[in-house]
Amino acid sequence: MNNFSRRSFALGAAAATTLAACGNGIGSAGAATIDARVDSTLNAMYAAFPGTLDLAARANGILVIPLVTEVGLGFGGSFGRGALRVGPSTVDYYAAASGSAGLQIGAQQFSHVLFFMTPEALSEFRRSQGWAAGADIEYAFSSRSDMLRAETTTSLSPVIAVVFGQTGLRLGATLEGTKYTRIIP
């Protein structure tokens, strides 16, 4: 009753391949959308935190994740997409994702920017298959523009993370453990 011929297999494989090709993001407006959001996020950050202009000028590269959405209720997770800029040019696109379990509740959205202050830190990030944010990052969380000043811009840390634009409330939120993976939008 289950007579599966080579012709049926070939037709099924061709249909699956055709269907898979329909979802290919190459040639879509995904990259342009991410770049526009990155530009908007950088302009908002520079306006709200003028001290980050000096930080950006000294950085070897900047990873901008314009919108990260975090949700947690016992188990939690976050996701966002952004671009790595070296100078004024976008060189790669990345997804940031994390998962967690434990005492947490709520949802929030925020923007974050990673400043790679040394060539080694940028090179390690770009070479890795999936880079995880850890203890070697200096975090600058701020809701007031006057608090993000000299202590951040004179830091000797190889990577500085600026987190801003938080909306919502989530207990137990952090960037630590976030994994960054290169994508093709």
Protein language model regions, located:
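Small-residue-enriched, tightly packed secondary-structure blocks
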Residues: 23-185
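N-terminal secretory signal peptides and thylakoid transit peptides that target proteins
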Residues: 1-21
